[in-house]
């Protein structure tokens, strides 16, 4: 259902938001790349809430440029 897709998007977005808030600490500590984050959460978030994905996609690109990823 649409509600389930939205709930899944929210669940997938939370770890991304937390990592953005702590300047990518977990991503750096665990060697997580930008591509890996996008591959893991992008499709699910976009399917459930395209506006949220557009926002996160832009923030993830800023994080990549700032060197917040581990690999």
Question: Which residue stretches match the model-derived regions?
Answer:
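Alpha-helical, largely C-terminal catalytic domains
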Residues: 1-71
